[in-house]
Amino acid sequence: MLYEIKNDKLSISADTFGAELHSIKLDGKEYLWQCGDAWKRYAPILFPFICSPKDRTYKAGGQEYHMAANHGFARDSEFAFSGSTKNSLSFILKDNDVTLAQYPYHFELEVTYSIKGSKVTVTNTVKNTDEKAMYFYLGGHPAFICDIQGGKCTVEYEKNEHIVQPCLLYTSPSP
């Protein structure tokens, strides 16, 4: 389900599916990628992995686990809407049978989107609800609309980067 908040400058909407932002509009202009054929997402939450382990398989506590998707399961999970204020939306994902089959940890992942003036703030809170140590990665993958008109846009990097394999960049040439 899609939820929206707005003020006099900014409006955002986010979905319970993946706790994913679907829109960021400033003065009525959309700044978030609107899910086209090139990429069918907007701004996924990456948890408990960024990219994935080799062959999507890893060991934890002496047992082998298989992560079903690249970047973990949060982006493909239904979050509960946990509340809103005039300026914020919050979503929560708790471990369940599907997550525990891929990731042997008890957790709560809360994602809160807040707006103030023309600023959007994203707050991610991961809570370990078990006694044992919990290992995870957390990231955001927002896609922004680039206003490319007449070829006046360039992409520059501070260092030369080389793609060694999907999801791996190195700043020095590969062997």
PLM features per residue range, with description:
Residues 1-60, 64-69:
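Beta-strand-rich N-terminal accessory domains
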Residues 3, 21, 89, 120-122:
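Hydrophobic residues embedded in beta-strands of well-ordered beta-sheets
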Residues 5, 95-147:
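Acidic, contiguous internal or C-terminal segments within carbohydrate-active enzymes
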Residues 6-8, 18, 52, 73-75, ...:
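Residues that act as N-cap/strand-start positions at coil-to-secondary-structure junctions
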Residues 10-14, 111-113, 155:
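Broad, structure-driven detector of short, well-ordered beta-strand segments within folded domains
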Residues 68-116:
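Extended, loop-rich substrate-binding clefts of extracytoplasmic carbohydrate-active enzymes
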Residues 143-169:
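A contiguous pocket-lining binding segment that forms or flanks enzyme active sites
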Residues 170-175:
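Conserved small/polar residues in nucleotide/adenosyl-binding loops
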